[in-house]
From Swiss-Prot:
Subunit architecture: Homodimer.
Knockout consequences: Pale yellow-green embryos arrested at mature cotyledon steps.
Compartments it resides in: Nucleus
Domain of life: Eukaryota
One GO-annotated biological process of the protein: root development
Protein known as: Transcription factor EMB1444
Species name: Arabidopsis thaliana (Mouse-ear cress)
Sequence segments annotated as region (Disordered): 537-566
Keywords for the protein's UniProt record, in alphabetical order: Developmental protein, DNA-binding, Nucleus, Transcription, Transcription regulation
């Protein structure tokens, strides 16, 4: 918002009881916060106007120091009074008595301790749409006034609404002589604000208004603007352009009280304390009843009055006739005469037109041509090339309904769009704001640039006419009714030939048709496309949103398993059934047990032929107890118990016919020695090819057929000695 924002804050404090005005800007971050964007503070010491609030010159000024401290505060959206006003849109009047009684925590939480100590007695916080919040402070107690709240919102609406007229009409006026000053009708003035009528007359009787030019570099040393009081705002100004008087509607709409060449924007506050921004243009002053009423039938697309409406009837009488038409609520007919262009003066800058360019992410935004100022001595010089810049339509009902989180692009407070004579968007009965989209062709944008550049040495009005005719064709015809979602929509494309075929008018004025607004309906919000120069038609297909998939329950997967993974799961399930105790093992343990079983089966297959060649028992029971001698050539080793008399041999180790294979036989009194013998054999790195037990009388006969691992050759005595160690302790105990 820059310099214009400073002007608005200064105008609010000028000639009023407010001592400072602060604008808290809504920054669309995560989380969204409000930071101090601009501030104006009335200096109590005449002649002292510090250039910055942080210059250290407020040590002797408690109010200036308190305002300077506000720049360090950050308000979260929805927290504190400022944050709550921003999210709710409801303004709040706060008095010092309320804070001092029982709400001391509010001072600390909102950072108002220094302000209360500096003498601030009234604080007003007003939400201005999705832009942010305005905070006012006064050293005296200011009574609640809904008209002031409405006026503040009007001022910021003028900055953020591209469909309205330019904001400079509110903040600047060029009145050169006292005779040209408009007079305020006493009836309107009394109804608007009887308490400030004297101050308003005094201000209007001053010799001109002190206006600070936008080119002024040192703004801080200028005196505050002497605007009309903040409870009034001129919505139309009578301007003299080449000897012609024109009544120009301002940014707040065209349905206002018009009497004696002056209009006062007033609001019937008995209906509601806060007037919706979308209804600001519908307040009409009724001279017969002395009250105000709303009208929704007026066509807001008319912009200017003809010369005959003003001059032929004596000026004021013509305005009275127009006021009667406003009271009747009827729309103005199409003008048959030339339409006046609302240039400030012949020395003022020429404001360029704008074209609508929709945005895909946030509704409609607009491509506007940059304003170019004309020098006093070069009225017919070439206009510079037009440059397009984006600005957000943050004042629309759609963005107000969706909240500040949706309008993220509305935080750019640079110089906003200013319309010269663009037709206002009119909402039909069967169409809502959420169904509007604007479609235009980029070919017409090039034509607008060519038209303005080719007439550089000609008349300035002819250049404006070419730009206006281009803009009139950029907006296509308004559709009568909405089509169902998903169906193709008929798109009307305006061609460049229609611009070229129209002959340039001498006055450079083309009357615009209010129906040159294209609305393409969509049930999901704003959506449109801009064609390139080679395109012939608009795309008609709309992307149908995908249906939400059902979420999978915990433990379930919405995706089907890959085939290879499913096969692995099946094989593991089979292994758990084959391997003993496999159902309780982990996958690693299951695989380890499987490997052991595979190795065992491999060894069995290798030694299967050896099991059939096992020799019969060589143990012979002799009654005499004599030692039997083996008849085999390989030899055998015997172990007997030596005692008082000879007994049957206990252990025998014998070589079999096949090399490396041995037969181990023994008689044991207990069968429990079988596992101990098997462990000893395995410890000797021998492979047990066969192991059997047989009951013989009171003793148990045990037989093993063994083989050395990896063809290892073992001596019989080594095996015999190891087995004797098993029985030796038991013989000793006996």
């Amino acid at each position: 918002m820059g310099y214009t924002l400073q002007q608005i804050l200064r105008s609010i404090c000028s000639n009023t009881d407010w001592n400072y005005a602060v604008f808290w800007k809504l920054n669309h971050h995560s989380p969204m916060v409000l930071t101090l964007e601009d501030v104006y503070c009335v200096n109590h010491e005449r002649g002292l106007m510090p250039e910055s609030l942080h210059g250290g010159r407020h040590a002797h000024d408690p109010l200036g120091l308190a305002v300077a401290k506000m720049s360090y505060h950050v308000h979260s959206l929805g927290e504190g009074i400022v944050g709550q006003v921003a999210i709710s849109g409801q303004h709040q009047w706060i008095f010092s008595e309320y804070l001092n009684d029982s709400h001391s925590t509010l001072q600390v939480h909102n950072g108002w301790e220094s302000q209360i100590s500096a003498g601030i007695k009234t604080i007003l916080i007003v939400a201005v749409g999705s832009c942010g919040v305005v905070q006012l402070g006064s050293l005296c107690k200011v009574e609640e006034d809904p008209a002031l709240v409405t006026h503040i919102r009007h001022l910021f609406l003028a900055l953020t609404d591209p469909l309205a007229d330019h904001a400079s009409n509110l903040m600047q006026c060029d009145i050169n002589s006292p005779s040209d000053r408009p007079k305020i009708p006493s009836k309107c003035l009394h109804e608007a604000s009887p308490d400030f009528s004297g101050e308003f007359d005094k201000a209007m009787d001053m010799e001109g208004l002190n206006i600070v030019s936008q080119n002024t570099s040192n703004r801080s040393n200028d005196l505050p603007y002497n605007f009309t009081p903040t409870y009034f705002h001129m919505e139309r100004t009578a301007q003299v352009i080449g000897g012609l008087e024109a009544v120009q509607p301002s940014m707040f709409g065209s349905n206002d009280c018009v009497t004696s060449g002056f209009s006062v924007g007033v609001v019937d506050t008995k209906h509601k304390n806060q007037v919706d921004i979308s209804d600001m243009s519908k307040v009409i002053y009724d001279e017969e009843t002395g009250g105000y009423r709303y009208s929704r039938e007026l066509d807001p697309n008319f912009q200017h009055y003809s010369r005959n409406h003003v001059r032929n009837s004596g000026g004021t009488s013509a305005l009275a006739m127009e006021s009667d038409r406003l009271k009747a609520g009827s729309s103005y007919p199409q003008l048959d005469s030339t339409v006046l262009t609302a240039l400030k003066t012949d020395k003022d800058y020429s404001r360029r037109n704008e074209v609508f360019q929709p945005s895909e992410s946030q509704g409609s935004i607009f491509v506007k041509d940059t304003e170019h100022r004309q020098e006093e001595k070069s009225e017919s010089s070439q206009l510079d090339a037009l440059t397009a810049s984006l600005c957000s339509f943050s004042g629309s009902e759609l963005l107000e309904a969706l909240g500040p989180a949706f309008s993220k692009t509305s935080t750019d407070y640079g110089e906003l769009a200013k319309f010269e004579s663009a037709a206002a968007i009119r909402r039909t009965n069967d169409m809502s704001h959420s169904h509007l989209t604007f479609e235009s062709s980029s070919e017409n944008l090039l034509d607008a640039v060519v038209a303005s550049m080719s007439n550089g040495d000609g008349n300035v009005r002819r250049e404006i006419s070419s730009s206006r005719s281009t803009q009139s064709l950029l907006t296509t015809a308004e559709m009568a009714q909405a089509e169902p979602f998903g169906h193709n929509k008929q798109n009307i494309v305006s061609t460049v030939d229609s611009v070229i075929s129209q002959p340039p008018l001498a006055d450079g004025l083309i009357q615009q048709n209010p129906s040159n607004i294209c609305g393409a309906f969509s049930s999901i919000g704003f959506s449109s496309t801009c064609l390139s120069s080679s395109s012939d038609q608009f795309p008609t297909s709309l992307e149908i949103p995908k249906k939400n998939k059902k979420r999978a329950k915990p433990g379930e997967s919405s995706r089907p398993r890959p085939r290879d993974r499913q096969l692995i799961q099946d094989r593991i399930k089979e292994l758990r059934e084959l391997v003993p105790n496999g159902s309780k093992c982990s996958i690693d343990s299951l695989l380890e047990c499987t490997i052991k079983h595979m190795l065992f089966l491999q060894s069995v297959s290798q030694h299967a032929d050896k099991l059939t060649k096992s020799a019969s028992s060589k143990m012979q029971h002799k009654d005499t107890g004599t030692l039997g001698i083996s008849s085999t050539e390989q030899g055998s080793s015997w172990a007997v118990e030596i005692g008082g008399h000879l007994q049957v041999c206990s252990i025998m180790v014998e070589n079999l016919d096949k090399e490396g294979v041995m037969l181990i036989e023994m008689l044991c009194e207990e069968c429990s020695h079988f596992l101990e013998i098997a462990n000893v054999i395995r410890s000797l790195e021998l492979i047990i090819l066969r192991g059997t037990t047989e009951k013989q009388g009171e003793k148990t006969w045990i037989c093993f057929v063994v083989e050395g691992q990896n063809n290892k050759v073992m001596h019989r005595m080594d095996i015999l000695w190891s087995l004797v160690q098993i029985f030796q302790p038991k013989a000793t105990n006996r």
